[in-house]
Each structure stands twice: as structure tokens, then as C-alpha cells.
Design a protein with these regions (language model features):
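Catalytic Walker B motif of ABC-type/P-loop ATPase nucleotide-binding domains
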Residues: 156-160
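Helix-to-loop junction immediately C-terminal to a conserved catalytic motif
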Residues: 47
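Conserved ABC ATPase "signature" region
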Residues: 96, 109-127, 152
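Conserved ABC transporter NBD signature motif
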Residues: 55-63, 72
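Conserved ABC ATPase signature
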Residues: 131-135, 139
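The feature captures the beta-strand-to-loop junction immediately N-terminal to the Walker
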Residues: 32-34
Length: 250
């Protein structure tokens, strides 16, 4: 995925300003930055949920606007911050939605097998008949990830997947993100506020400030106290844990 000179305005105000970057295939790339930096807007544009005002997003050598929705949904899955489905659904029924681009709602035995596999991968077999609105936040997020796995796309876009989760469930969610890449071969792009999760679980980090890219590179290249101080306007210290540069800020 190649983004060039991407621009987005709201009410005349530029919120994404001529942004260009390329997403490394088969890796985890985290978008970080302060509130209002443009991270989620960029995510919305590259997933085609938000219309752009300028620039291009090339996906498999074709601008993303030219893809038919059904074909794009076989290659790219998006999980937004808010996933409030206004229906009484069980976990299995939710995960079944992941097969819609392929089956159109008429699942084959192969579709059902893929659904079974996705539910098992997220260890939801024992509660697959429970309703989504009866689950804990962590269980619900795992159910949505199972739906994404059932969609069987090469690219997975996650907008703040740890939002509203406690430390235990948030860290488990990040382990799942890592597994999507390492075990299932996905290219994962996610928006994160917790920079230490980005540092520990990502391969690359793209840091935004005021609608522009401040720094893009490997975790080691981005996670310096000088870079982070420029991005967040607070003081940082960097320490290494398990070979990863993690930050202390105050």
C-alpha cells in the first residue's frame, strides 16, 4: 500500500497535510501521535471509509477508489473504534459476517469451516453461542477480531484496538495483533495511543503531528527520547526491555 500526498480537510481546516508513506508488506505498522494529529483520519481514508481531498492511495498497483467494494473486502479488513451493531447477535453470527464478501450470505461448507477456524483461533468455541451484548469488553473485541480473521484478507486495519480495555485485555489484544502477522501472514496497520505497545509489538512506527508525518521508520529509529519529545512535547527516558526500546514519560 502506497500513500502519496494525501490531504483531508474539514470545514476548510487541513487535518491531513500532504502525507506520503508506504506500508511494509507482512509487517505490523503502528500510527502514533497526539490527539488530533490525523492518525484515525488517515486510517479512515486508506480504508475508504473517509473521502480524501487530494493525493492517492495505491493498493496492489491500483488506486483504492477504483476497487469494487466486494473485491476490496476480500483483500482489506477494517475494524473501527466503535463497532456498535444494533442487532441481537451471537459470537458465531457476528463472525459469519466475515464471509459475506465471498458467500453473499449463503455460506458453503468451506465458509463454515473458515468460521470454525476463526472462532477456535480466538479461543471462543465455548461461548460462541453467547450474545455480543452480554460479553465483557475483552471478549467482545476478540469476537470482532475473529470476524476479521474469517474475512481472510491480507491487510488488516485496526483503529485503536486497545481502546476501553484494561491492561490485561489490552496486552492480550496486542499479542493477538502480533500473531496475526507472525502466524497468519497479515499486514497489520493500527492506530495506537499507548506508545509502549507500539514499540513492543510493531515492526514500524509512523508518527503524526498536526496532520503531517514527523517520523517514519523502524521501532528503533522512531523510539528515541529526542523524537518522542518533539512528537508529544513532554520529556522521555528510553530503556531497553527484551531488546525493545520502551519509554518512561513524565
Amino acid at each position: 500500500m502506497d500513500v502519496k500526498n494525501l490531504t483531508k480537510k474539514y470545514d476548510g481546516k487541513t487535518v491531513v497535510d500532504s502525507v506520503s508513506f508506504e506500508i511494509p508488506k507482512g509487517k505490523v505498522t503502528s500510527l502514533i501521535g497526539p490527539n488530533g494529529a490525523g492518525k484515525s483520519t488517515v486510517m479512515g481514508v486508506i480504508s475508504r471509509l473517509i473521502a480524501r481531498d487530494g493525493g492517492s492511495v495505491n493498493f496492489e498497483s491500483q488506486d483504492i477508489s477504483k476497487w469494487k467494494s466486494k473485491e476490496l473486502a476480500k483483500r482489506l479488513a477494517i475494524l473501527t473504534q466503535t463497532n456498535n451493531i444494533q442487532m441481537k447477535l451471537t459470537i458465531r453470527e457476528l463472525v459469519t459476517f466475515g464471509r459475506f464478501p465471498y458467500s453473499g450470505g449463503h455460506n458453503t461448507a468451506e465458509d463454515e469451516a473458515i468460521i470454525d477456524k476463526a472462532i477456535a483461533y480466538m479461543e471462543l468455541q465455548d461461548i460462541q453461542d453467547q450474545f455480543i451484548d452480554e460479553l465483557s469488553g475483552g471478549q467482545r473485541q476478540r469476537a470482532y477480531i475473529a470476524m476479521v480473521i474469517a474475512q481472510d484478507t491480507e491487510y488488516v486495519l485496526l483503529d485503536e484496538p486497545t481502546n476501553n480495555l484494561d491492561i490485561y485485555h489490552a496486552s492480550n489484544m496486542m499479542k493477538i495483533v502480533r500473531r496475526l502477522c507472525d502466524e497468519l501472514g497479515k499486514t497489520v496497520i493500527l492506530v495506537l495511543h499507548e506508545i509502549n505497545y507500539a514499540a513492543f509489538y510493531s515492526d514500524y512506527i509512523c508518527a503524526f503531528v498536526d496532520g503531517k508525518i514527523k517520523k517514519f521508520g523502524t521501532v528503533e529509529e522512531v523510539m528515541t527520547k529526542e523524537n518522542l519529545a518533539q512528537i508529544y512535547k513532554v520529556d522521555f527516558e528510553i530503556m531497553e526491555i527484551e531488546g525493545k526500546p520502551l519509554s518512561i514519560y513524565y
